[in-house]
Amino acid sequence: MTPYIGSDAIKPYTELLKQKGKDLFVVLRTANKTASELQDLLSGSRLVHMAAADIVNRQSEKMITRSGYSQVAVVGPANVADVLKKLRARYKHFFILIDGYDYANANAKNCSYGFDQLGHGAIACANAGILSAWNPDLSDGRDYVRCAEEAAERMKKNLLRYVTIL
């Protein structure tokens, strides 16, 4: 969901989320090349994506579960470490979906900034890097599942170099 139309985009879902025990992901800052054209503009003294985070925070604070994280979660970019650092430092109860692990300039170290000190509170997502892991030059095409599994394992191994899960 997008917060860029205001808090009334999120409010209608909060009661339903509580009743059904579901979660909602709100996109704050994306990983695509031109995201900064809008999401990194200044809104007063804040960047637009941080102003959006404040809007999300007002709703998410009311929906913190036993885990310590809110049912209203956020999406942040794997290729912009500063955004993940700011989100984790400022909003301890945000669960962060770190999108774009396989984008240019993204890496496991960047992703590590979205996790809390216990190695919780985030999940890193790679799309094409796993779905397109099969290499036609190295295979006859029947082992695409194995190739995807190996790509996911490499991603996990790389993340665990920077994130300690307690």
Label the predicted regions.
Residues 1, 21-25, 116-123, 144:
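A polyampholytic, Gly/Pro-enriched intrinsically disordered region
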Residues 1-73:
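Conserved anion-binding
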Residues 8, 47, 51, 79-82, ...:
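Conserved active-site and cofactor/substrate-binding residues in soluble primary-metabolism enzymes
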Residues 12-15, 51, 86, 110-113, ...:
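Alpha-helical scaffolding segments of alpha/beta enzyme cores, especially the outer helices
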Residues 14-18, 57-61, 85-91, 156, ...:
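Surface-exposed amphipathic alpha-helices with a cationic face
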Residues 26-30, 52-55, 101-104, 123-126, ...:
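Short, surface-exposed, polar/charged, turn-prone segments marking secondary-structure boundaries
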Residues 74, 78-125, 129-133:
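A C-terminal functional module that forms or caps the active site or interfaces directly
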Residues 110-117, 121, 130-166:
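C-terminal helical cap(s) of enzyme catalytic domains, especially alpha/beta-barrels
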